[in-house]
Amino acid sequence: MTEISDDAKRNRVGWTKANADFTDKSARHTWAAEEITWGVFGVPEASLHTLGDVAGRDVVELGCGTAYVSAWLARRGAHPVGVDVTPAQLATARRCQNEFGIDFPLIEASAENVPLPSESFDLAVSEYGASIWCDPHFWIPEAHRLLRPGGRLWFLRNSTLATLCAADEGPPAETLQRSQRGLGRIEWPGEVSVEWQLPHGEMFRLLRRTGFVIVDLVELYPPDDAVDHCYYDTFSVEWSRKWPSEEIWVAEKTRGPQ
């Protein structure tokens, strides 16, 4: 395994616990899903069209967790590689690979330092993986390195507004709870894990400076039949119907970093 940061070590501890509490038990359900859906409330990709045709594409999933996204893409003809820093989640992913007969490489590494050759992939994806659990000043340039010219970066994260309204304790507020100025690295009270959330302007500048052009930014709202999540309860359906709690970014590699 490549060298990892102290924050990555903390997040590995946090996700080892989360895997024991929830993601190991939920993995079979997500692997079995026929439809691609995104985020806590399961917004169908068919209603968004953010991903495009993945058949024949080489895909790297950065912060893959139990690798259900890679499994979804493999069923659609992609050639995925999953990368994650948490051995427990990769063990769950391997068990699901054996059960469902879907095989692809799984690599234990931080998305900030991936032991794979440059320009090896057509698509890099992250649904609540590297997109919030890795330092974007490291993982986004690393995604750029891994992508071929014209390759796309796709990632889903919490919306900036949701982060600004998130209370340190209790349900989300309908008023701002923190300053946007200086928003970036976040340590929530009582949590071992470390999150990252750059405001939109800083994220735009980072992507452009790295050598990406922004293709799309989609704010997500729950489907009509959505219910509150049984485990990820930071934002309720009621709150998220009024304001987007999640967002998808799509960017294309056009040149080298500046």
Give the residues covered by each predicted segment.
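Short alpha-helix
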Residues: 194-217
